[in-house]
Design a protein with these regions (language model features):
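Short, glycine-anchored, charge-dense loop/turn motifs used at functional sites
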Residues: 332, 503, 570-578, 605
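Residue-level detector of functionally pivotal "anchor" positions at catalytic/ligand-binding pockets or at interdomain
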Residues: 531-557, 623
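C-terminal tail/sorting-segment detector
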Residues: 542, 594-623
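Beta-propeller domains
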Residues: 76-103
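Beta-propeller domain segments
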Residues: 21-30, 74-75, 82, 109-113, ...
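Beta-strand-rich domains and repeat architectures in extracellular enzymes and scaffolds
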Residues: 41-86, 420-424
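Blade-loop segments of beta-propeller domains
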Residues: 94-125
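Asp-box/WD-like beta-propeller blade repeats and closely related beta-sheet repeat scaffolds
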Residues: 152-198
Length: 623
């Protein structure tokens, strides 16, 4: 495992625990510079909290910013969140009140069995929500005519991605529901249905979907019994090869689509219906791996381009129970947490391109999972995984398994993170042009929030890991819980965290009791930074040139004519610093090469050169 710097966010303490977070010209962070406020909880009894909350299993949320008339500053934030049993609720940040705004019928409510992952599992607001009022939901719809137990209707279980519009009265208009994806679920299993979603800066929607399988049978194998039995004679419940390792299945991975109301394409297969209402961005799993295999195995490359063999929506395969997702705001790196083999081995993943992450064959650092009585095909390894199951309708030869970035459980000696559910929080990108007095400071630029749920302590934990500024790896060495450098906030089994439009951190606490219950005091909190280290905005409306700093522009780059040292940065129009590199002497910078290295896309940016001779800035368009 790569070395990594880890800081715990648990109960509030008074020690100077932020000391290891530093930034040039600013003091090290202090605990007193952060203010944690519980916006509302289950009872809402505190007058400072929202009234009428009455929470019951809140699982996911999103934050809406209400802006000033100039549109450049957040006045306050509203929160939309869902409860697993189907209620959609709204926290009014101005009135400080929680109200129910709708109910989505779902199998988690219809079924009398509460111990499952079915229900209303995900919510995300459209990037243009303030004008179009669109909300996306991931849920397991009700089964028409099914009894409360649902035992006679297992074959009709489904997984669904929908878009619903709010009315002018801020209520769900169920008649407006637009179903984007509707597929069959497991016939007998109710677990690992996924649901967390996020949008990236390109307007692409990322959706996590677990393997929708309990994937353990009597032998303890993740995939036993499914390579020798006809899929028509048995259910796929006990097979990870049916979902996680099946490239033609939506289950066991992460999908990426681009919602487009004008898109009319509809595709159906044996599992369900895809579309209309979205397009598929280039560069997903099939596109990427076809390109990788073009030279070495053209026949296999052709299979990866076949939409009947590789689902076009798929970006990641090989997950088990991934109930979190985050995308780096500027670099586009994809992060998620996954509950791995036997629910005792968890991992955090961070990738820069489509990948197969191992399940059901491998976990953690590509440690094999138990195969039970199954004899794996000749040639099967982490470098050349093979899905030979009769349950497999996708490609047989999978890409090399990508190991996790962080893992813990029976396969590691990492004891500071030993809980039962790995949840990826957001990755922070400091925006110096954002007008906000509470946004997190530049010390935490490129930091990644990690969370654990249940286990010991039963309330879960939160950490901040610092990422390398260029590559998706972690910095530093482990910090043990309780030592200097540990950051602490109060959490009660945190299921989700995300940064709001004002740069504050929001945390959803499921509650301190176990899963599938009303929970002991669930709620949502906000953490504001109240310190003094905020950087001045970067001017992006005009070009500047220092009298003694000689920089020459050319078609696709620039040359710094400088005898000493300098820094070259690329900044987007929101003030996010895409990257910074240091140079000495005369240096030529090629925009296409830098784009390939740092992963920024076409658009308008500010190129910035700084040395002891001054500062040079120029708006550039990358086509």
């Amino acid at each position: 495992m790569k070395q990594w710097k880890l800081f715990c966010l648990c109960a509030l303490v008074s020690a100077p625990i932020y000391a290891q977070f530093t930034y040039p010209s600013c003091n090290p962070l202090q605990q007193s510079e952060f203010q944690a406020t519980e916006l509302f909880n289950k009872t809402g009894a505190n007058s400072a909290q929202a009234t009428n909350s009455g929470l019951n299993e809140p699982v996911q949320f999103d934050v809406q910013g209400v802006y000033n008339t100039n549109g450049d500053s957040v006045l306050y934030t509203n929160i939309y969140f869902v409860e697993r049993k189907g209620k959609v609720k709204y926290y009014d940040g101005l009135a400080k009140r929680v109200d129910s705004i709708g109910f989505i019928p779902n199998w988690g409510y219809q079924s009398s069995n509460n111990s499952n992952d079915n229900g209303l599992m995900g919510i995300v607001l459209d990037p243009n929500f303030n004008t179009n009022k669109w909300i996306y939901f991931w849920y397991t719809p009700t089964i028409p005519g099914a009894a409360a137990t649902g035992a006679s209707s297992n074959a009709n279980r489904r997984l669904r991605l929908s878009r619903i519009t709010l009315t002018a009265q801020n209520r769900l208009d169920m008649a407006s529901e637009k179903i984007l994806i509707d597929v069959l679920g497991s016939k007998t299993d109710q677990y690992h249905c996924g649901g967390p979603m996020t949008f990236d800066r390109n307007g692409d929607l990322w959706v996590t979907i677990g393997n929708n399988s309990n994937d353990l049978n009597g032998s303890g194998s993740q995939y036993a019994g499914q390579t020798s039995t006809s899929p028509t004679a048995t259910d796929s419940n006990n097979s990870g090869e049916w979902g996680s390792a099946n490239t033609a299945s939506i289950r066991g991975g992460v999908i990426r689509i681009h919602p487009d109301n004008a898109a009319t394409t509809v595709r159906t297969d044996r599992s369900g219906t895809y579309g209309p209402g979205y397009t598929v961005p280039a560069g997903n799993f099939g596109d990427y791996w076809a390109g990788q295999f073009d030279q070495s195995n053209p026949t296999l490359a052709a299979q990866y381009r076949d939409p009947s063999k590789v689902l076009p929506e798929v970006y990641i395969k090989g997950t088990r129970s991934n109930y979190s997702v985050a995308v780096h705001p500027t670099k586009g790196w994809l992060a998620w947490g996954d509950v791995q083999y036997n629910a005792t081995n968890d991992e955090y993943n961070l990738v820069t391109h489509p990948a197969f992450t191992g399940m059901p064959y491998f976990m953690a650092n590509n440690t094999p999972t138990p195969a039970g009585s199954i004899v794996l095909p000749t040639g099967h390894s982490a470098a050349t995984p093979i899905n030979a199951s009769l349950m497999n309708s996708g490609v047989r030869n999978l890409p090399p398994a990508t190991p996790a970035l962080i893992w813990y459980g029976t396969t590691t000696t990492q004891t500071t993170m030993n809980n039962n559910v790995a949840i990826s929080g957001p990755i922070y990108s400091y925006n110096r042009n954002l007008k906000s007095s509470v946004k997190f400071p530049p010390h935490l630029n490129n930091s990644w929030v990690l969370m654990t749920v249940y286990g010991s302590p039963s309330s879960g934990q939160m950490y901040i890991a610092m990422l390398d500024s260029i590559n998706p790896v972690l910095q530093g060495t482990p910090q043990q819980q309780g030592t200097a450098g540990v950051v602490r906030f109060n959490v009660r089994n945190p299921l989700q965290a995300k940064y709001g439009p004002e740069g504050a951190l929001y945390i959803l606490n499921y509650g301190s009791t176990g899963a599938y219950g009303s929970g002991n005091n669930p709620g949502i909190s906000r953490i504001n930074y109240t310190g003094s280290c905020q950087l001045a905005a970067v001017p992006i409306a005009k070009n500047t040139r220092a009298a003694n700093l000689n920089v020459s522009m050319f078609v696709d780059g620039l040359v710094v004519h400088e005898g000493g040292s300098h820094e070259f940065s690329m900044i987007d129009l929101n003030g996010h610093q895409i990257f910074t590199v240091k140079g000495i002497g005369e240096t030529r910078y090629s925009f296409p090469k830098l784009s390939a290295q740092f992963g920024f896309k076409k658009g308008v940016y500010l190129a910035r050169v700084q040395s002891n001779q001054g500062v040079f800035t120029r708006k550039v368009s990358l086509l």
